[in-house]
Amino acid sequence: MSILLYFIALLSLIIIKKIKDSNRNLPPSPLKLPVIGNLYQLRGLFHKCLHDLSKKHGPVLLLRLGFLDMVVISSTEAAEEALKVHDLECCTRPITNVTSKLWRDGQDIGLAPYGESLRELRKLSFLKFFSTTKVRSFRYIREEENDLMVKKLKEAALKKSSVDLSQTLFGLVGSIIFRSAFGQRFDEGNHVNAEKIEDLMFEVQKLGALSNSDLFPGGLGWFVDFVSGHNKKLHKVFVEVDTLLNHIIDDHLKNSIEEITHDRPDIIDSLLDMIRKQEQGDSFKLTIDNLKGIIQDIYLAGVDTSAITMIWAMAELVKNPRVMKKVQDEIRTCIGIKQNEKIEEDDVDKLQYLKLVVKETLRLHPAAPLLLPRETMSQIKIQGYNIPSKTILLVNVWSIGRDPKHWKNPEEFNPERFIDCPIDYKGNSFEMLPFGSGRRICPGIAFAIATVELGLLNLLYHFDWRLPEEDKDLDMEEAGDVTIIKKVPLKLVPVLHH
């Protein structure tokens, strides 16, 4: 009898809450279970689960994850309202257990709460690293690292052996960013090497964005994280990341300005110099934690997005021979035979179809399928629904880029769709948002595009590509969490063109 009364009381509470929610004009929501909310519906890849739920319940969707309210936006129109009309009201970030620990309570650019500190950090990072002038100044690094990659691929081509192009492209982008941002090669530091950094990136990815402590505040969430080993793992990864960052900064502190090599002064030298010259009365003071946060943002975000974009582009080209032939014909016709076979960044400007291939890849395979979460700072209205203050907003750009309302045959890889099409990836067109929009748009767009375009140009100019004989078809299955990579590494056989 008591159990029956308990369930009647519980059912009554659910009905009362549902009536209250309907009176508040909240977005539609799938059936929620007590305590866990909608967690039971989120199996598999997170962005695809949200895509499927949005198709069923609408492009503005309210989910309850434990005790956490989250609104998922999956349409162009809703995204424009959130990121343009209400940009200021929802441009802060939620603080989670993982981001609080790994990013030192938001001392970086990507995950910092909105305020003066964020504005100053974005201004500094743009001035010292992301401006058009700065990006151009790093072109020789991009060209040199691509030449090294081509040299290694030629050795594999002569042996007629396959290469792990996923690993190759992560290595390429990692080397470019490490030299550009930190002024040294992987092999120049005693404490820094490509394998160690790749392992750390993988560990950070595995931790995910949310923990049980975020979903179930109080003792329950903490206890589950403690028993599962999540807290211990989080602390271990933080110590490893922090130790690596300390080594990178110490390497710069040991070198005086007179000893700086041709790759320097880099962003770390510049920011360390600013820290030394700060005065007591300055309204904003740059800290070592800010410096560490900027380093993490540049490397972790920069390597993932650029490498993943090139991997998906090459996979789609191999899967679509018509597009592969068209882009290679353009490249080889426009560039011709190069002296010493060295590609220069100026060559990219001639290649309009290559640029369309990059656009189409960013539409179909945004490296981060969900924009970093925002949090509302006041109540706003999206598509007629009330979104309360302190609600997490997730924009599903993977879903938006495949919306049949705005894209004909959205699952098809067709770069021609962008001919005479004003839609771009710079945050002004809400039909595709691979880098976000508004005050929290990714500051590294110019650097990423320069890296991707030159990398693809080198791969497509010097080599033809085919699947290894043992592979009959290309597996395009996705994997990942914050960023989405091919589940099966991209292994191809390079064939020398000349």
Swiss-Prot record:
Transmembrane segments: 1-21
Enzyme's top EC category: oxidoreductase
Cellular component aspect of the GO annotation: membrane
Cofactor(s) this protein cannot do without: heme
Keywords, sorted A to Z: Heme, Iron, Membrane, Metal-binding, Monooxygenase, Oxidoreductase, Transmembrane, Transmembrane helix
Residues that, per the record, bind heme: 442
Disulfide-linked positions: none
Main location: membrane
InterPro entries in the cross-refs: Cyt_P450 (IPR001128), Cyt_P450_CS (IPR017972), Cyt_P450_E_grp-I (IPR002401), Cyt_P450_sf (IPR036396)
Localization terms from the record: Membrane
Superkingdom: Eukaryota
Topology with respect to the bilayer: Single-pass membrane protein
Entry EC no(s): 1.14.-.-
One GO MF term: iron ion binding
Family, per entry: Belongs to the cytochrome P450 family.
Protein name: Cytochrome P450 71B24
